Regions:
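Short aromatic-glycine motifs in intrinsically disordered, low-complexity regions
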Residues: 307-316
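C-terminal beta-strand-rich structural cap/linker in extracellular carbohydrate-active enzymes
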Residues: 338-353
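Beta-strand-rich binding/interaction modules
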Residues: 317-323
């Protein structure tokens, strides 16, 4: 990726068959490389990568191949409808902005790790612009018109099943509203607190608003675990999704695998841990499917040895976690850092019905 930047001046956005397609949203190289760096994989030129990230994050839109609609995002904190796509049916402004928020949060994490305090503060603040899109009336994120008003009329279910919907790409407002992995607590406050957050998230699953066949809402099941006492909902929903949509039949995944994303979701979920925020080295835990999994790590980066994930689960009906240990010590949290995992190395789950 860094070589691509050296060759033509930009990080890849959606490279396919050795060519850039400019498909989809965001600035994805930032969270990918930041994630690697913060997990200890540092055999590359991080300063050159940072140079590339700053270019895409600060270059004016007319000269910015990575973020062509950056100007209003920087000036207002959001991207209004019609700024980049005059045809409303092809406008993906909210989706674009959400990806930029995630990328900017990752850039803030990297800047902090590199000792660039001013950059870290700037990009963290930019990553919180999602709040502009939240509509109390609909209880969802909502596209914003050029004059700053919310799109009206508005149905948060529009856009489901890949139908056209102003503001959102391949999904509805429900598929995107909880896509704030870097500020879950902030989103909870917007929604009226933890209870309201959980109820609204459960509403998505109970009313068929979650789309298991595409990526925007792929991490939704793991958000329940961000509220103490509600972790069982994560365990229940993940188990139900694995059972219903991931099988050994020819159509064994619910949608396009998209470079392995759906398969990766299934594998991580089956192992019992899921990377819940791009660019932040953390995992949310859930009930594993396997009795034992060994992750062989490169001793160059992880000299303490491999990771072993084990469980006493003997029946599919044992959906819920009773207790967990990491490195032989009791775990009291359902979210652990990459460092805690690689240093503890032995993660064990005791489960129950």
């Amino acid at each position: 990726m860094i070589d691509m930047y050296k060759e033509w001046g930009w990080m890849p956005k959606w490279e396919l068959y050795s060519r850039e397609t400019w498909t989809m949203e965001g600035d994805p190289s930032i969270p990918i490389i930041t994630d690697m760096y913060l997990k200890g994989l540092r055999g590359f030129d991080i300063n050159k990568a940072y140079e590339a990230f700053m270019k895409s994050a600060t270059t004016a839109g007319k000269d910015n191949k990575q973020r062509p609609d950056l100007d209003p995002y920087v000036e207002k904190g959001y991207i209004p409808l019609g700024f980049f796509a005059a045809d409303m049916s092809g406008d993906n402004s909210v989706s674009h902005a959400l990806e930029y928020y995630v990328a900017d949060n990752a850039l803030a994490q990297l800047a902090s790790a590199l000792g660039k305090k001013n950059d870290a503060k700037l990009f963290r603040q930019r990553s919180l612009g999602y709040k502009h899109y939240y509509s109390k009336e609909s209880g969802t994120l909502r596209p914003i018109n050029a004059d700053g008003s919310f799109l009206t009329p508005f149905n948060p279910e529009d856009g489901a099943n890949f139908s056209n919907c102003p503001g959102f790409h391949e999904g509805s407002a429900w598929n995107y509203t909880f896509y704030i992995p870097h500020d879950v607590n902030g989103l909870m406050k917007l929604m009226g607190g933890k209870k309201a957050f959980v109820n609204r998230l459960q509403h998505v699953f109970d009313n068929g608003l979650y789309d298991p066949a595409n990526e925007p809402d792929i991490a939704y099941p793991y958000l329940f675990s961000r509220v103490a006492g509600e972790e069982w909902r994560t365990q229940k929903e993940v188990a139900a999704l694995l059972d219903k949509y991931y099988t050994d039949k020819p159509e064994g995944i619910p949608g396009n695998d998209d470079c392995g994303t759906m398969s990766a979701w299934a594998i991580m979920s089956m192992m019992g841990l899921y990377p819940d925020c791009p660019g932040e080295p953390y995992y949310t835990l859930t009930t594993p499917v396997f009795s034992k999994v060994t992750l062989h790590l490169n001793p160059k980066y992880y000299p303490k040895g491999d990771i072993v994930i084990s469980s006493d689960r003997t029946s599919p009906s044992q959906l819920y976690i009773k207790n967990m240990t990491l490195g032989g010590k009791k775990l009291t949290t359902y979210r652990i850092s990459h460092r805690e995992l690689t240093e503890g190395r032995e993660l064990h789950f005791s489960v129950k019905k």
